[in-house]
Amino acid sequence: MTDGRALRPARPTIRIDGQENASLSGGLLELRVDETADGLYACEASFGNWGPRDGATGFLYFDRRALEFGKALEIRLGTESIFRGLVTALEGRFPEGDAPRVSVLAEDCLQELRMTRRTRTFADVSDADVFQAIASDHGLRPDVDISGPTHKVLAQLDQSDLAFLRERARAIDAELWVDDRTLKACARQARNEGTVRLGYGNALRELTVAGDLAHQRTSVKVGGWDVSAKQALEHEATESVVSGELKNGVSGASILSSALGDRKESVAHTVPLTLPEAQARAESLFRRRARRFVSGRGVAETTSALRVGAYVTLEGLGPLFNGAFYVSWVRHLFDGSHGLRTEFGVERPGLGSA
C-alpha cells in the first residue's frame, strides 16, 4: 500500500513526443489532469509565452514547433506518468497586466472513439465481442475482462464509438479506459489500480463525505419482453449484489428499509429481450446506486498512485467514515500559488459501525 506522505517532486515534468522538454517544464504555470470512471482522461497545461528567443524578445511557442496539434504529450511526477495523450487544442491567453500565455489541451486516445460516429448493428455477440471489435477498428490492443449475456442484436444508432461503449459498459457494470494504446474494460471488482493510505491532517488535506439515502433503493426491477417465448420477463436485484463489497459496513438499502421503509424501483425503458439481459441490467443499476451511498470529495497531497480505480484507505475520520473507498474521479492540479495538489472523489456502499 502506498503511503500518501512519501516524498514527491515539487512540480511536474513535460514530455513531448517521448522527450522531456526542459523549457516547457520550467515554464509551466498551471496544470489540470482529469480522470473519470467513464474513461477519456484529459489535460490542460498553461505556459509562459513571452521571453527571449533567437536574439530577440517575443512569443516563445507560436511557431508550433514544440507545441503542435497531434503531438504526444506526457505529464510525469518524477518517473511516474499521470497523463498520456495527444494535443487537440492550442489556446492563446492575453491577460491584462501580465505576460501572454499559451495553453494546450490534450486527451488520451479515446478521443479517436469520441470523434467517430456511426449507425450499425452487431448480431449474436457478447459485450466483450463488441469491445474487441471496436478496439480493432481503432488499432487499439484489447484487454477486456467482462462477462454478460449474448445478444441477438445490439444497435449503435447515430452514436460515437465512445458513447456506445460507455452505454454497454453501464449495462453490464463495467468500467472503460485506455492505458497508452490498450483499450481496457472490466468489472469494478476486477480493476486493480493499487491502494493508497491517506490520513486526515497528513496527506489528506480536507474531505467532505456523506451517507445519503436520497437515491438509494431497496430493490431495482427491470422488465422486458421475450420475443421468442412471447412472454414478459423481469428480474429484481436486491442488496445481495453488493454484499461482497460492504467490508463489514451497513448498506444504504438496509438503513433505508429500517429508517424509512422499502423503496422499490421499476425500470421499463431498457427493454431487455432475454432474462440474462434483464438480470445484468437490474444488477448493474442497483450496484451503481448502492455504491454511491457513502460518497465524498477531498483534497490530498499529489501522488501518481491516487488514480481512478484505486482504493484509498482514509484514516482519522471516525468510525462512520474510516476505511477503504473506491476512487471514482481524480483531478491533479498545479499552479504557482498552491503548488501540486489532487482533488478526488470516493464512494462505497457501506457506512461504518458507530
Put a short name on every predicted segment.
Residues M1-Q111:
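Assembly/oligomerization scaffold segments
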Residues V33-A66, E206-A354:
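An acidic/polar, Gly/Ser/Thr-rich interaction patch typically located in mid-to-C-terminal regions
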Residues L113-R114, F131-A155:
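N-terminal export/assembly leaders
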